[in-house]
């Protein structure tokens, strides 16, 4: 009987530890996904142009914005 209680306790600790690891990993995954979101300040045409040239006014004129 003592052995079965020890086995149950061990399995419980194992399950709780695994759950904590999985939930922690998922939390990190969610944070990473949010950090990759890019805030757009300009329309897509201007945004791409600015990434290449760095000149906002020139890009707005070229894109007709």
Swiss-Prot record:
Tell me the GO molecular function terms: potassium channel regulator activity; toxin activity
| S-S bridge residues | 45-63, 49-59
Which residues form the pro-region?
Answer: 28-39
Q: Which UniProt keywords apply?
A: Cleavage on pair of basic residues, Disulfide bond, Ion channel impairing toxin, Neurotoxin, Potassium channel impairing toxin, Secreted, Signal, Toxin, Voltage-gated potassium channel impairing toxin
Question: In the record, which residues are listed under signal peptide?
Answer: 1-27
Keyword Transport carried by entry? no
The subcellular location is: Secreted
Tissue distribution is: Expressed by the venom gland.
Q: Name one GO cellular component term.
A: extracellular region
Note what the entry says on domains.
Answer: Has the structural arrangement of two alpha-helices stabilized by disulfide bonds (CSalpha/alpha 2(S-S)).
Its function, per the record, reads: Potassium channel inhibitor (Kv).
Report the sequence similarity comment from the record.
Belongs to the short scorpion toxin superfamily. Potassium channel inhibitor kappa-KTx family. Kappa-KTx 2 subfamily.
What is this protein's name?
A: Potassium channel toxin kappa-KTx 2.6
Q: Which organism is it from?
A: Opisthacanthus cayaporum (South American scorpion)
